[in-house]
Regions:
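Beta-strand-rich binding-surface signature
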Residues: 6-8, 24, 31-35, 60-65, ...
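Ordered, soluble secondary-structure elements with a strong preference for glycine-centered loop motifs
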Residues: 10-14, 37-40, 47
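Short glycine-rich, basic-tinged beta-strand/loop micro-motifs
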Residues: 28-44
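Short, hydrophobic/π-rich interface segment
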Residues: 42-69, 73
Length: 93
């Protein structure tokens, strides 16, 4: 099993505030930079998490970098499908 990074919040099917609170927890632990990552339909939720974090909860954080890409995932029927990805780097001074 892959080891989870402490400074990464993986966005999925849960509510947005769960991920915002996870990011705030990482910042309060002393992380200077966190990454909000998502794939597919969760990309818009990851953007919402970053914006809520920046505009409502931690006004001194900045969006350092946004990486977009594509992952190849094995389909249930065989073969591969392309899934879009996003990685939003948030930095606290």
């Amino acid at each position: 099993m892959a080891e989870m990074d402490d400074n990464v919040v993986y966005v999925g099917k849960k509510g947005i505030m769960n991920y915002v609170m996870a990011a705030i927890t990482q910042i309060n632990k002393g992380e200077k930079e966190i990454h909000i990552k998502a794939r597919g339909r969760s990309i818009s939720k990851a953007v919402d998490v970053a914006q809520l974090l920046k505009n409502r909860f931690e006004s001194d954080v900045t969006v350092e970098n946004v990486d977009i890409g594509t992952d190849e995932v094995e389909a249930d029927e065989g073969g591969t499908i392309n899934v879009s990805t996003i990685d939003i780097a948030i930095k606290k001074p």
